[in-house]
Structures are given as C-alpha cells and as structure tokens.
Amino acid sequence: MASRFPKFSQGLAQDPTTRRIWFGIATAHDFESHDDITEERLYQKIFASHFGQLAVIFLWTSGNLFHVAWQGNFEAWGKDPLHVRPIAHAIWDPHFGQPAVEAFTRGGASGPVNIAYSGVYQWWYTIGMRTNQDLYTGALFLLAVSAVALVAGWLHLQPKWKPSVSWFKNAESRLNHHLSGLFGVSSLAWTGHLVHVAIPESRGQHIGWDNFLTTPPHPQGLTPFFSGQWSVYAQDADSSGHLFGTTEGAGTAILTFLGGFHPQTQSLWLTDIAHHHLAIAVLFIVAGHMYRTNFGIGHSIREILDAHVPPAGRLGRGHQGLYDTINNSLHFQLGLALASLGVITSLVAQHMYSLPPYAFLAQDFTTQAALYTHHQYIAGFIMTGAFAHGAIFFIRDYNPEQNKSNVLARMLEHKEAIISHLSWASLFLGFHTLGLYVHNDVMLAFGTPEKQILIEPVFAQWIQSAHGKSLYGFDVLLSNAASPALSAGQSIWLPGWLDAINSGSNSLFLTIGPGDFLVHHAIALGLHTTTLILVKGALDARGSKLMPDKKEFGFSFPCDGPGRGGTCDISAWDAFYLAVFWMLNTIGWVTFYWHWKHLTLWQGNAAQFAESSTYLMGWLRDYLWLNSSQLINGYNPFGMNSLSVWAWMFLFGHLVWATGFMFLISWRGYWQELIETLAWAHERTPLANLVRWKDKPVALSIVQARLVGLAHFSVGYIFTYAAFLIASTSGKFG
C-alpha cells in the first residue's frame, strides 16, 4: 500500500476524513510531535532547514537584482535620483487595454512597469553600484551562494556530516563564533566594503574587480594605521557642498564622526557609517573571545548565571538552573531570539526614516512610508511569536524541579500580581485616552473647539530639548549654551547633529504637541493590552485556578469537553490568537500616526495634523477619508490611471479581511451541515457523482477555523492598508 500523507504521523495518515490533510499541514513543522523523532534528529532537521531558509533568501535577493538589471532603469535613476522613478520590474498582462498600458508605462520605460518602493535602488547606489553589469554580477554571485546553501543543507543530513547533539548544545562555542564571526567579522568586512568601494564611488572614483587591489582608499594608505596616527583618517572630510557620486567637494577622510546628514543626499555621512561598523566590529570580535571553550580561559556562562543570586536571599535563587533550562529548550531559545529580533526590526523601522542611511531615501516619501510600515508589521508578528514559543516552553520544556525558586519559578508564583498590574495599566490608559478623545470630539461637534482638553507632552519635549532641539525653549543639556556636553562635542559630531535636529526638513525628533500626546497614549494602550494577553497566555499555559491541569492538554485545545464549563478559549494558543488582533490594531494606530504626521510635514502643512489629531473625527475625516480619495478615483468615468491597481488591491484587501469573519464567527456545526448538504447534492448529481472523495469531508476544528479566520483577517488588513499607504503617498508626491 502506498504511504499516505502525512508520513511523519501514522495515526493521522490512517484518519478516514479530510482532517488528515489539515492536521497534516498544521503539524508538518512541529518536529517534536512526529513519529520516531529523537532529540538528535530534531536538532539535525532544524539545522538543515536553516540552510534551506538561507537558500530561499539568497535566491529571492538574487531575483531582485536580476529583474532590476534586466527590466529596471538603475543607470538612468543614478544620473537623476530625485526625478526618475525607480522601476522594480516590467508587467506583462494580457488583460491590459491601451489605457492600462499607457497608465503603467512610466520611468522612461517602453511598456508597463511596476515602480520600486522598497528602497533597493537607494541602497545599491549608496554601497557603490552604478551599472546594470554590477547588478547582474551581484545576482549571479547570490545565485551561487544560494546553491551552496542548498548543498550544505543536504550535506548536513548525510550520516557522515550530521552534527551531534553535544555540538548543538555547546553554548559557549556557539556564542563565541556568532559574536566574533557572524557579527564581528561581517561588520569588519562591511567596513572594508564601505571604505574600499562605496566611499570612493561616492567621490566619483570607480572601483571594480579590475582595480580594487591597486587603488588605496586613502592617499596615505596604511601608514597612519601602523604609526598610530589614526586621526589622519578623519581629516579632510567631504565638504557640505559635496555632490554625491562626483569629485566636486569630495574629501579624502574614510572614518569620521561628523554627525548629522549629507546636505545633498539627506542621508548619514558614509564615512560616519564606516566608522560605526568598524567600532561594532572591534566590540564584537573582542566579545567573541569572552567565553571559556578549549583553552580553560574566559567566562563560563553556567558559572555567571549560578552566581547571579540576589543578596539577602529575599528574591529567591536568581538565575540558578537557567543554564540547563535554556540550553535544553529550543522553544526558550527561539522565544529569546524572536523577542530580540522583534525589537531590532521595530528599531529598523524607527531609524530608517529618522536617520536615513541610504542616499536620497529621505526624498523618496513613498519608499520611506512603505519601509516604516513594512518593518513595524514584521516586528509585530515576530514579537507575538516570541510569546507563543515562551508558552510552548512552559508547557513542554519547563521542569519545576530544576528551577525551584529561581527567576522563572518566581514569575509563575507572582503571575497574579504581574497580570493584574498589566490589566490595571491597560484599563487606565484605555479609559483616560478614549475619554479625552471623546470629550474633544463632542466639543468640536458642539462648535466649541476651545473647550478641548489639550495636554502638552512636556516630558517628551524636555527629552527632545536635552538632545539639542531648541524650539521649545527649555534650557537643558544640549539646548543650554553653557553646558559642558555642548562644549566637549563642538570639535566633532555636535555641529552636524545640532544642525540636523533643528532643521525642519528631516524627521529627526519631530515637533510634538497635544495630538502626539494623545496618540502616544493610544499606542501605549495597544502595547500594554497586547502584552497583557500574551503574558497571561504564557504564565497561565501550565495551569490556572480555573484549570490547574491545563498543561496536560497541550498548547492548543478548544475545550475540555461539554462536561467541564469554562475550559473553552483558554489554551495558550487562544491567548496568542487574541493577541494578534490587538497587535494588528496597535500597529494600525502606529502607522496611521506616522503616516499622517509625515504627510502633513512633507506637504508643508503641519498645522493640519496638529489641529485635527486631537479628536477622533479628525482622524477619520482628515486622515482616512481625505487620503482615500485617490483610491476611490482609481477607476472613474474617465477610464483608469496608475493608481488603479492600488484601488483594486484596496477593495480586494477589504474582501479578504471580511472573509476572515466568516471563519471567526460561524463554527463547526454550521460548516459540518453545509458540507454534508453539498456532499449529498454532489453524490446525486449526474456526472459530478463520478468523482468521489477518498476522505470523508468534515469541517475544520474550532482551533483551525480560528487560524484560517485570523490569517484572512491579518492578510486583508495589511493588504488594505498597504494599498492605501502607497496610493495616497505616491498620488501626492509622484
């Protein structure tokens, strides 16, 4: 008999219903639950899959480079980055009539194309690429790297090349290699690329495979390095009149600390970026020699953790027992990694616009908006994932004996206090913020706007002033002419920084007022509520007063049967599921805020945000409704335009989003009846009844239907906002 899907679970493979297919897909990556899995095979499978992931990433980035080189306008864009629209790739669509062909033929192309809003043009230009040949070379190189990654993944599944479990659990060696090798050496290599290729290219000197070994990046070569006169590398920086990519106004410095932005490109100075990466490299290469491995020198992580016992004994055993708990739990490690990655991704969103690293990115408003929104959504999904795997850790891997009275055990002991404090913070933020918004709404509706309650964010303004923003008139730290901090930095980074922070033409420390105060607290409400749901889900994953034996039921269960009331919807999976809605809701507010504030700044109309953002009707009318007009006009009586595709995506996104509710609100019985009715009709219809299922059709389980509903809700929500964001921004700024 041929083996049926899924091969990894004989129990499921023998299921006579369509449940076999859905549960098979749902558990395909839950290696721990598969038949005949051993700890060794588990680690090896995950290790090999990492190479597969890398292969996919390199293939994808190779495709980006290839399509821009083949169908884009990279060389034309490089000659005039502010006026030529960058092309991502051509569009071939047999449905296009003449109006569509004309609408989508842009950027100097001969046929319909997509415009790139990803920032790759700015990135490739900044790092020294200038020709299509450069792009093709990069695409080919990444294709080769992708192939190597695939072979490596296959190789590490072969008997001779399978690493042992002890190798995977050698935490000190892994940390040393990742710190020194992954972060340290790659940062050093990137510094090398910036100094040897990107900086000379930014000064109009072409560096290629033919001359990079013979062209020193600094007139004095390595002499200052070996003679200890490192400051020579910072002398003669590019002038403020430097034209990027040309010799005009170019200097010779390679490692600087200028602060602020290049006046023409509005991006960070390349020589500052190189200096930053060099510092990071030194730091991480040193850090990668910290932990004790073969030579008996350096720190032992186990000893460090075991020594972390709070004094006076009032706070338990501190970090004792954590080494084995973390080292033996893949879910704990994944939770930590996801939490870190989530924070970093959100930081990328924040820094991409406030300190733009790529030349001319600051002038490409749609790309800035797209990059901010993209990174914030990714961060949200990654962070919720951290808590999901934290909850799975508590269910599958946590050992109370190993963790007696340490920090993990005490978290569980104090969970009521933790959860109730979070709940109190969420309630306080929610009622007060909504109360202020609604009060202001009513005052506007009654024609007495002067009766609004408007609170200046004085603490935030004070912090901005401390960093040198002089607008608010606080006489503090870098806003105080007599401050020692001010005089100490005058010779290096401060003048550039102070120019930038007090310039009205960038997004560094935006001017804030009562509208910002309110939306900040709305976002704080969203963050605290999301965290409340996630933390409660993880801390109650093993059991609660209502259901002390919860961990016996696993991560996701719908209920414990009809005979035990109150056990529905309380699995750790359900907490994750609910938290994702709150996460999406919160990031909605974050991106609305960012986008509207920037639209008004870019249009030179900051007063609109300041005046309309203090009441809900202002957000609905002056942000959402006003900026959706381009989308609504994508199709009109006069034909179509280049925003039509976004208008269609806006509608399609709403459709997908609404479909989610069909799964979220109607449950198994409804679907089971519907399916049985359809099957009955099918079996009694001539011709149709010649086709039979092997599996008996059954409705999705409650948990699965929720997942399908959540997936549609999330995808529809993001599609809708992406279309709105790109159309409303590109419609205004071209």
UniProtKB/Swiss-Prot annotation:
Residues reported in the UniProt entry to bind chlorophyll a B1: H654
GO terms (BP aspect): photosynthesis
Co-factor: note: P700 is a chlorophyll a/chlorophyll a' dimer, A0 is one or more chlorophyll a, A1 is one or both phylloquinones and FX is a shared 4Fe-4S iron-sulfur center.
Annotated positions binding phylloquinone: W671
Positions that bind [4Fe-4S] cluster: C559, C568
Domain of life: Eukaryota
Subcellular location: Plastid, Chloroplast thylakoid membrane
Enzyme superclass (EC): oxidoreductase
Transmembrane segment boundaries: 46-69, 135-158, 175-199, 273-291, 330-353, 369-395, 417-439, 517-535, 575-596, 643-665, 707-727
UniProt xrefs under Pfam families: PsaA_PsaB (PF00223)
Subunit architecture: The PsaA/B heterodimer binds the P700 chlorophyll special pair and subsequent electron acceptors. PSI consists of a core antenna complex that captures photons, and an electron transfer chain that converts photonic excitation into a charge separation. The eukaryotic PSI reaction center is composed of at least 11 subunits.
Similarity comment: Belongs to the PsaA/PsaB family.
Protein name: Photosystem I P700 chlorophyll a apoprotein A2
Organism: Zygnema circumcarinatum (Green alga)
